[in-house]
């Protein structure tokens, strides 16, 4: 009996028993409801091939696909006060930071890097939306300022990929201060005669839209990206009118002259490098 219990039954269970399936093995398309194999989605730059829906892409994945041969140098994350207001909502802000750092492997919501895109050197700044909604606080603001300074030192363009809900509530007025700080940094970049290109991705809202996201020399956007300040529901309740279909989507904005061009994620490296070459040549 012991032989059956200890040897035969475990072997049978190992053959016929249920195997654990990873939770992220399949991803559901928000547009069509189709199930997509996670590995295929990742290899296709987080674009669902059947519907061409652009999913949110991790910041480092975007850098990998942007730079030539996935080679780039990450810029150091500035050291700042982590919880200046000792803020607490339903949990301590410092604990929320620890959770998001563990989840994403990042220090904060901004990742910056320098490298070559189609043999053209540039600095790229990318929002990580999964880090507290890509919100901007002291650390993110300082990272953007340092990225602008690095671009000026390297005499190369800066490309910004936005994906954010806006200012970080847990840092209060200190978060709002980053909006004029980053605006000044962008103006320094422009005063140096260097191109500043913004790629608006889904979603780009709040204080980020009200500051550096809309200060580019050229504004590109991914298909279907939500871009605006306040949300659709808030606007409708305020003006008491029904907004047009597709309002605040990139297609609506390019039609009404708010952005310059919609670019498929697969084409971004080629388009960005071409624009950088044209803009850099024009100021030489």
UniProtKB/Swiss-Prot annotation:
Family of this protein: Belongs to the AccD/PCCB family.
Domain CoA carboxyltransferase N-terminal positions: 25-284
Localization of this protein: Cytoplasm
Catalytic activity entry: N(6)-carboxybiotinyl-L-lysyl-[protein] + acetyl-CoA = N(6)-biotinyl-L-lysyl-[protein] + malonyl-CoA
Record GO cellular component, one term: acetate CoA-transferase complex
Biochemical pathway: Lipid metabolism; malonyl-CoA biosynthesis; malonyl-CoA from acetyl-CoA: step 1/1
Record lineage: Bacteria, Pseudomonadati, Pseudomonadota, Alphaproteobacteria, Hyphomicrobiales
EC numbers, comma separated: 2.1.3.15
Name of the molecule in the record: Acetyl-coenzyme A carboxylase carboxyl transferase subunit beta
Record text on subunit structure and interactions: Acetyl-CoA carboxylase is a heterohexamer composed of biotin carboxyl carrier protein (AccB), biotin carboxylase (AccC) and two subunits each of ACCase subunit alpha (AccA) and ACCase subunit beta (AccD).
UniProt-recorded Gene Ontology molecular function terms: acetyl-CoA carboxylase activity; ATP binding; carboxyl- or carbamoyltransferase activity
Organism, scientific name: Liberibacter asiaticus (strain psy62)
Biological processes, Gene Ontology terms: fatty acid biosynthetic process; malonyl-CoA biosynthetic process
Highest taxon listed in the record's lineage: Bacteria
Presence of the UniProt keyword Plastid in the record: no
NCBIfam families: accD
Keyword presence, Chloroplast: no
Principal localisation: cytoplasm
Pfam families associated with the record: Carboxyl_trans
Keywords from the named record: ATP-binding, Cytoplasm, Fatty acid biosynthesis, Fatty acid metabolism, Lipid biosynthesis, Lipid metabolism, Nucleotide-binding, Transferase
Protein's job: Component of the acetyl coenzyme A carboxylase (ACC) complex. Biotin carboxylase (BC) catalyzes the carboxylation of biotin on its carrier protein (BCCP) and then the CO(2) group is transferred by the transcarboxylase to acetyl-CoA to form malonyl-CoA.
């Amino acid at each position: 009996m012991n032989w059956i219990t200890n040897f035969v039954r475990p072997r049978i269970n190992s053959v016929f028993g249920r195997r654990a399936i990873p939770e992220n093995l399949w991803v559901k398309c928000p547009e069509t409801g189709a199930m997509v194999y996670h590995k295929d989605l990742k290899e296709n730059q987080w674009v669902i091939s059947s519907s061409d829906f652009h999913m949110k892409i991790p910041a480092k994945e975007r850098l990998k696909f942007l730079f030539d041969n996935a080679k780039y140098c990450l810029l150091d994350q500035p050291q700042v006060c982590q919880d200046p207001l000792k803020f607490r909502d339903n949990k301590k802000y410092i604990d929320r930071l620890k959770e998001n750092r563990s989840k994403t492997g990042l220090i904060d919501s901004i990742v910056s890097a320098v490298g070559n895109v189609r043999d053209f050197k540039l600095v790229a700044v990318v929002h990580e939306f999964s880090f507290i909604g890509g919100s901007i606080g002291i650390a993110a603001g300082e990272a953007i300022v340092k990225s602008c300074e690095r671009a000026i030192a390297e005499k190369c363009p800066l490309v910004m990929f936005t994906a954010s809900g806006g200012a970080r509530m847990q840092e209060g007025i200190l978060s709002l201060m980053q909006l004029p700080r980053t605006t000044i940094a962008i103006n320094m970049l422009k005063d140096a005669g260097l191109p500043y290109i913004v790629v608006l991705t889904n979603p780009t809202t709040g204080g980020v839209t009200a500051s550096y996201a809309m200060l580019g020399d050229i504004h590109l956007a991914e298909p279907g990206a939500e871009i605006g300040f306040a949300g659709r529901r808030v606007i409708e309740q305020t003006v008491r009118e029904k907004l047009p279909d597709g309002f605040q989507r990139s297609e609506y904005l390019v039609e009404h002259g708010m952005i310059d061009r919609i670019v498929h994620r697969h084409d971004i490296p080629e388009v960005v490098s071409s624009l950088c070459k044209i803009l850099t040549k024009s100021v030489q």
